Amino acid sequence: MLNLLVLALPLLVSLVHTAPAPGQALERAGIVGGKEAPGHKWPWQVSLRCLDQYWKHFCGGSLIHPQWVLTAAHCFGPEKADPLYIRVQLGEQHLYYQDRLLLVSRIIVHPNYYDEVNGADIALLELEDPVNLSSHVQPVTLPPASETFPKGTRCWVTGWGDVHSGWPLPPPYPLKQVRVPIVENSECDMQYHLGLSTGDNIPIVRDDMLCAGSEGHDSCQGDSGGPLVCRVNGTWLQAGVVSWGEGCALPNRPGIYTRVTHYLDWIHQCIPRES
């Protein structure tokens, strides 16, 4: 990694995670137990790139407005990242084959973010120019604040990350998808306490988080920040942002996502109404 990127992006070490140590909470987001996504099924899917000999994919994201991308704060860390060294790719099915990289003018990390396990793992990227929308490039709809995404709701997570812990996605680097069920927060928190010394009265899964996944079907390391979407009354809504978890697709360890409804006010404050 270039020295300038070490300074600008202190948490890009997540790019080189291998198999996680037991009990270790890690950044997420490859696809385990899934399959290649049909072409342009997810037109809001974003690949974030940093300069490391080439513009290398390091995180996912979602287009939520013609000029704004939603992603995870841990992709950048609590320190201010320099948008000069970040690019965005939209409308791509396979990484690196037809790159048309877009410039980023601003990176906004949530002010309460410290690390992903403590919540507020959410960030916004403002593009230098609005994108031209098409059948291949469309923003995803944000949910209403009242949407709870109840237990058992079947949703989809997408990304270009590891296909198993420590097993990177092989060429031709297709976008992967997997269907995952929503797990109730209280149940997810109970599962994460199993085998840990953390007291049951100390929450692991917080109110601003959302759990989804089952054994053999999950997100994984290498593509954090990507979208978890659920179809509600015929409309795809972004329920979560891929955040963290223990291992990949392990029993009693669902993937943990930033709950988008918890941060709707912050998102709307950051994105000017006239933009």
UniProtKB/Swiss-Prot annotation:
Organism of derivation: Sus scrofa
**A GO biological-process term:** proteolysis
Check the UniProt entry and state the signal peptide residues, or none: 1-20
Question: Which family is annotated?
Answer: Belongs to the peptidase S1 family. Tryptase subfamily.
Q: One Gene Ontology cellular component annotation?
A: extracellular region
Descriptive protein name: Tryptase
Q: List the disulfide bonds.
A: 59-75, 155-230, 188-211, 220-248
Please give the SUPFAM superfamilies that the UniProt record associates with this protein.
Trypsin-like serine proteases (SSF50494)
